Regions:
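C-terminal catalytic "cap/lid" subdomain
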Residues: 1-195
Length: 195
């Protein structure tokens, strides 16, 4: 998934040039980004979708120092790129770690984790390849109050459940069911850009 580079948005604003984001796969009209749009006020410059995702959940690991290091050093050793990470602490000194990878790595990661079961000492592994990541992108996202709320409102209004959330200075990403990804992009687009 490709989006507008922040610098292109800055240059368009500086020289009063309207931008239009279009798909290279369809002839559908794109999204116009211009001065005075609602998106500008909320620091959002684009919406992106990535369907090449899988969610890995390692369930009931020991909740001890170094557990996350063991998991992610193992992934690094096998050149597995990690995106969103979520750790949740359960009961009885156990925790679960979930993370996203490229869908094409799912089978390989399943094998890596199976081979490392004794070392990692987990109860189970679940890999879901029917997920997608949808992101809003823009400058200063982390310090823009209300942007995440508006994104989540759009998804809730469309009946879309959020599986994982990740934020950074330039984007807010959610992991959702793949079947909802197109509907999610439209709902988020309508929320920030209008019709």
């Amino acid at each position: 998934a490709q989006v507008l580079h922040n610098r292109s948005v800055e240059m368009a604003k500086k020289y009063n040039v309207d931008l239009e984001v279009v798909s290279s796969f369809t002839r559908n009209p794109g999204t116009k980004v211009k001065e005075g749009s609602n998106m500008e006020k909320l620091n959002v410059s684009g919406v992106a979708r990535d369907n090449n995702c899988a969610r890995v959940a390692i369930i009931n690991l020991n909740d001890t120092p170094g557990t996350a290091f063991k998991v992610f050093s193992l992934m690094a050793k096998h050149n597995v790129n990690i995106d969103i990470i979520l750790q949740s602490v359960g009961r009885d000194n156990k925790k679960s770690i979930s993370f996203t990878i490229r869908q094409d790595d799912a089978e390989r990661v399943a094998g890596i984790l199976r081979d490392a079961k004794e070392m990692l000492d987990y109860e189970d592994v679940s890999i879901n390849t029917k997920v997608a990541k949808v992101s809003i992108v823009g400058a200063g996202m982390a310090s823009a109050a209300g942007v995440a709320s508006k994104m989540f409102e759009a998804l809730a209004g469309a009946g879309i459940n959020i599986r994982m959330i990740s934020t950074s200075e330039i984007k807010i990403s959610v992991l959702i069911n793949e079947e909802d990804s197109e509907k999610a992009v439209k709902a988020i687009h309508d929320q920030f850009f209008g019709d």
